[in-house]
């Protein structure tokens, strides 16, 4: 895997399993640092860990400093729902920081897109993902029809400013 290059991350069956998990779980209102102004959508935290070792190993092959992954998030977007331009970096007073962000398309919807500022990306297909730096501005646009569902993982490393 390389940063900013789409790749096949999940099989169709794995996407369907994550979709079923998300649809059968209680959804929360999406918030950023406790606020909902930047986004309007629904989320589910993916707490099953059966695939986590595989995902962690994938990130560690990219950078050995990766120690763990945060609980992944399943995000749901229907017409009128979106996540405006933002970054995934969190306050640097924590012992660990988000080192990489992975976003995967579980279900596409008409005109809904994941966009990275300063990068021209193709529309991701079901199971495709992209890995980028959390400091990169990105957003999820609203579908005009249907429901877009995405899956996000944050790979964590030590915050070197807290050593």
Predicted feature residues:
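Non-heme Fe(II)/2-oxoglutarate
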Residues: 1-67, 71-73
């Amino acid at each position: 895997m390389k940063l900013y290059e789409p790749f096949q991350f999940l099989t169709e069956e794995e996407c369907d399993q994550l979709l079923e998990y998300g649809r059968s779980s209680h959804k929360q209102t999406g918030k950023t640092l406790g606020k909902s102004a930047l986004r309007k959508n629904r989320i589910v935290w993916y707490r099953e860990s059966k695939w986590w070792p595989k995902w962690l190993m994938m990130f560690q092959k990219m950078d050995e400093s990766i120690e763990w992954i945060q609980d992944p998030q399943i995000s749901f977007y229907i017409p009128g729902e979106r996540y405006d331009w933002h970054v995934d970096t969190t306050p640097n007073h924590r012992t660990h920081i988000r080192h990489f962000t992975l976003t995967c398309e579980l279900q596409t919807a008409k005109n809904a897109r994941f966009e990275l500022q300063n990068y021209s990306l193709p529309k991701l297909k079901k199971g495709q993902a992209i890995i980028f730096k959390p400091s990169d501005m990105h957003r999820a646009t609203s579908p005009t029809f249907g429901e877009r569902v995405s899956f996000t993982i944050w790979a964590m490393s030590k915050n070197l400013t807290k050593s």
